[in-house]
Each structure stands twice: as structure tokens, then as C-alpha cells.
Regions:
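Bacterial Sec-dependent N-terminal signal peptides
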Residues: 1-25, 31
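Subset of outer-membrane beta-barrel
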Residues: 22-210
């Protein structure tokens, strides 16, 4: 009963924090390990290549399509893990797209014979772009109007650096991880104003049953 009360307290505390949705979410969390937590880089004994594809509302024209690929490897002699990620998100028939390329590094620290901690950091470069030739506006369809597109865009693309970090505490039977993405809250506005990406927090845990 006391354990159940503690669990409810944790749920309430986590629920007290506001969440802002701006990143793509894959339904199979552990099938995209580096997107869940950079500290998962190198947790496999072998070379690992992961691919993900997500098509939201495929029956509707101009659906949201996201795909990513990652590679990570364990460097046992250095107690480290390295990983690389590429992700692309397309919205509105590909008119608006975001591409991110990055790398992560994780290091394993043995706390004692049963516990270990893996801190990690990630650095990525993002590019957000809009293709105005894929967009059509009502005034373009009027007879006699110029078909050229007029917009308030300062640039048709913008680049930014993105920083992430995370950590995993684990033993033989359990693990607990936390990660934060967009630590530096990069500005990805195409209008020349301020449009900062909010930080994304992930908490994940598990227990291995005998």
C-alpha cells in the first residue's frame, strides 16, 4: 500500500508539469532509442541500425510524413557509446519540411557491482524550409491575376543548432532514464521573428521480470 501511494505521488508530480507538443512522436518508443534518450547510444553489444516511418492521416491529401534513421555502436574499451541520427518531417504535401542531422555520445560510469549510470549529450543541426511552389492561394486562381506567390517570409529556409542530453541509471533488473531535447531552445522562425522550440522532456523506466 505504501508503494502504491508513492507511485501516485510521482504521477501527480509529473502531471503538474505542463507539456508542449512540437516534436514527432513514434508509437514504438524503444524502436527509436536515440530519439527517446541519447544515453541509449551503445546499449547494444552489436552495431545497431534503426529506421522509423510515420504517416499520419494517410487517407487525407497532404498528410504528415516523418521518417528517421539512426546508427549507434558500443565502444567497450572506452566505456562509451556513439550514435548518429538523421530525421526528416514533411507537412502539407512537402511544402514545409524539417531535417535534422546529429550525433550523440554516451559514457558509462560503474557506481558499484550492481549499478551503473550513463550520462550522454547530443548535438544536431536542423534545417527548416518551405517550398512556396507547392502552395496555392485563392488569389492565384482568379482570372487575370499574377500567379507569382507573395508571402511574408524573410527566408525560405533557416538553420539552427540543437542540443540534447540524457542519463540512464540501471542495474541487473531495472532501468530509469531521463532526457531533455532542445535545451538551447533554438529559433526556427521563417518570418524573422521569434519562434523558439520548447524543450521536450522524456522519462522512461522498466523492470525485468524473472
Amino acid at each position: 500500500m505504501r508503494l502504491l501511494k508513492k507511485i501516485w505521488v510521482l504521477v501527480i508530480l509529473f502531471g503538474a508539469f505542463s507539456a508542449v507538443a512540437q516534436d514527432v512522436q513514434y508509437s514504438q518508443f524503444y524502436a527509436s532509442p536515440l530519439y527517446l534518450n541519447p544515453a541509449l547510444a551503445g546499449t547494444s553489444d552489436q552495431h545497431r541500425v534503426v529506421g522509423n516511418f510515420r504517416d499520419q492521416w494517410p487517407a487525407i491529401p497532404g498528410s504528415y510524413i516523418s521518417y528517421s534513421i539512426s546508427y549507434d555502436v558500443n565502444i567497450s574499451e572506452a566505456h562509451s557509446g556513439l550514435g548518429f541520427t538523421v530525421q526528416r518531417d514533411q507537412a502539407g504535401s512537402g511544402a514545409l519540411s524539417t531535417t535534422t542531422v546529429g550525433g550523440v555520445y554516451a559514457y558509462e560510469i560503474k557506481l558499484n557491482r550492481k549499478l551503473a549510470f550513463r550520462p550522454a549529450i547530443g548535438l544536431a543541426y536542423g534545417n527548416r524550409a518551405v517550398d512556396m511552389t507547392r502552395l496555392k492561394f485563392g488569389d492565384q486562381l482568379l482570372t487575370g491575376n499574377d500567379i507569382s506567390v507573395q508571402s511574408n517570409l524573410i527566408n525560405d529556409r533557416v538553420g539552427y543548432m540543437d542540443i540534447s542530453a540524457g542519463g540512464i541509471l540501471y542495474g541487473n533488473e531495472f532501468w530509469f532514464g531521463y532526457s531533455i531535447y532542445h535545451i538551447n531552445r533554438p529559433n526556427n522562425s521563417l518570418l524573422g521573428d521569434e519562434n523558439y522550440i520548447d524543450a521536450r522532456h522524456n522519462i522512461h523506466t522498466g523492470y525485468r521480470l524473472p
